[in-house]
Amino acid sequence: MSKPFKLNSAFKPSGDQPEAIRRLEEGLEDGLAHQTLLGVTGSGKTFTIANVIADLQRPTMVLAPNKTLAAQLYGEMKEFFPENAVEYFVSYYDYYQPEAYVPSSDTFIEKDASVNEHIEQMRLSATKAMLERRDVIVVASVSAIYGLGDPDLYLKMMLHLTVGMIIDQRAILRRLAELQYARNDQAFQRGTFRVRGEVIDIFPAESDDIALRVELFDEEVERLSLFDPLTGQIVSTIPRFTIYPKTHYVTPRERIVQAMEEIKEELAARRKVLLENNKLLEEQRLTQRTQFDLEMMDELGYCSGIENYSRFLSGRGPGEPPPTLFDYLPADGLLVVDESHVTIPQIGGMYRGDRARKETLVEYGFRLPSALDNRPLKFEEFEALAPQTIYVSATPGNYELEKSGGDVVDQVVRPTGLLDPIIEVRPVATQVDDLLSEIRQRAAINERVLVTTLTKRMAEDLTEYLEEHGERVRYLHSDIDTVERMEIIRDLRLGEFDVLVGINLLREGLDMPEVSLVAILDADKEGFLRSERSLIQTIGRAARNVNGKAILYGDRSTPSMAKAIGETERRREKQQKYNEEHGITPQGLNKKVVDILALGQNIAKTKAKGRGKSRPIVEPDNVPMDMLPKALQQKIHELEGLMMQHAQNLEFEEAAQIRDQLHQLRELFIAAS
């Protein structure tokens, strides 16, 4: 049930925030299609957007460039709007190998994927909220531009149950089977139902902690109640309930029958073309594969790889855009593109890569030409579908600036009064020794340093050099997985080491108030890693510390360096002026380490309502030294499974803690063995 958006925050807008909120709201009310919010690091961009949403009361989609930032935004929005529907929509694949064919080696690679059940449930919850409520905020990744089930067909397939309605038990079971729910009287889990006499228990696909009990008397629905599927305890009785399909790709029977006829027609036309071109192998392969899929669809209502026939199933013409999450967003919805300088180019690049792979499959008879229409949106289609949009970035790209007509909403002044870092340019010749002395100064006063290099080799050599000179240093690179990366950042903040060396990982989304110095080596080498936007983003990592400073090592000033330094000085000047006028003394951020690492941990926290206390993890210190190796090995296996579960649920901090415990347990195991 919809409620008005209610913003929950102990803070009131300050600094540049009130003016930014006013200008954005005025622009939206005046019908501006595109606006850009240029918000520096630490200026509270998310809080500004939350205020705009609360004031205008409009359903909103927030696009983030990756899962980690999406999880961070989800966590923040959840805190701002605890009473409203804040949802999370990202790719549900933990692992995905798309179908592909390599002609040079005559190798066909079957589609292989591992689906994260919890994220699948959250995706279903997101679309349900968008169809049912007005007070909805969906935080999504670029997964939002990929094909999804048609919302019209999805709505047609819903099963409405109300107390007092006349319906036969077998009719309910038949409808549940059409929604792809499976009967399972033993293991009651998401997307299943069980039958006990005249009682049907249904575990909705979009829920993780509430199930529905339907009690029938003869052919009448006598009672509907929600209960905890774990304990069986009744939570509440309700007058009505709507059951949504188990997946977004459910299609009514009549639509499937019609689609099958259209597929047969396309197959006949394609066979003719292949035979005319003397492609006998391709013709045989295509006929065999397509007929097998048609038989599966006829018998079961779906087949493996059914998304390749999505054009027929959604009733769209050749070349028309596929249905996506944007089709679920109400007409007056609002789109917020976070870190737009990264997200917008991502959207533009998705279509071409997907098409190149599928054209090969079509050419060699693995798929019908209609498979090309199972694709992400083209950039022009995204532009046509996008509602009123706010682009949010510290370094907006040319596209956003052009679309906004150069009229950018500035949010440069931070509520804390913190200034942008002081920038110095120093010569390359002595960069390593100069850096070493700067590191020692910072380490002496318990502050941290980030160093960014151009190549992996240089990062490794620099790390080794600093270690030889007694510095506590770690190296962050692309081979490190997400959990370990978060652990490294946490350890830096906790003071386990003083210097973090990286290449291109020290940019968007890393908030480390303890970092007072950012050193950029070879800053005068113009290119992607030393562009104006890259430099501003990297310099911004020191903007959360009162003593923030950035040193650019370069023998000459490139155009990118000049622009980055000029922009930083413009911001610093404006911030200083505001502080003087309002008597503000800059204050450092005392953000708890856990706050930054809890990236959307609300996503998968098991609700303990009525379930008793959760079983504590065994601390290695409490493990008896005489514990048998076999028992230790069993405990290690248990914790490994738990660690992977936390990692899949984006609970990075818990995963890192278990990892530390595993390390100690393994040492005990070796000693015991």
Curated annotation (Swiss-Prot):
Residues 633-668 form the UVR domain. The keyword DNA damage applies. GO terms for biological process: nucleotide-excision repair; SOS response. Signal peptide: none annotated. Keywords: ATP-binding, Cytoplasm, DNA damage, DNA excision, DNA repair, Excision nuclease, Helicase, Hydrolase, Nucleotide-binding, SOS response. Residues 26-183 form the Helicase ATP-binding domain. It comes from the Bacteria. It is found in: Cytoplasm. One of its GO terms (cellular component) is cytoplasm. Forms a heterotetramer with UvrA during the search for lesions. Interacts with UvrC in an incision complex. The UvrABC repair system catalyzes the recognition and processing of DNA lesions. A damage recognition complex composed of 2 UvrA and 2 UvrB subunits scans DNA for abnormalities. Upon binding of the UvrA(2)B(2) complex to a putative damaged site, the DNA wraps around one UvrB monomer. DNA wrap is dependent on ATP binding by UvrB and probably causes local melting of the DNA helix, facilitating insertion of UvrB beta-hairpin between the DNA strands. Then UvrB probes one DNA strand for the presence of a lesion. Belongs to the UvrB family. This is UvrABC system protein B.
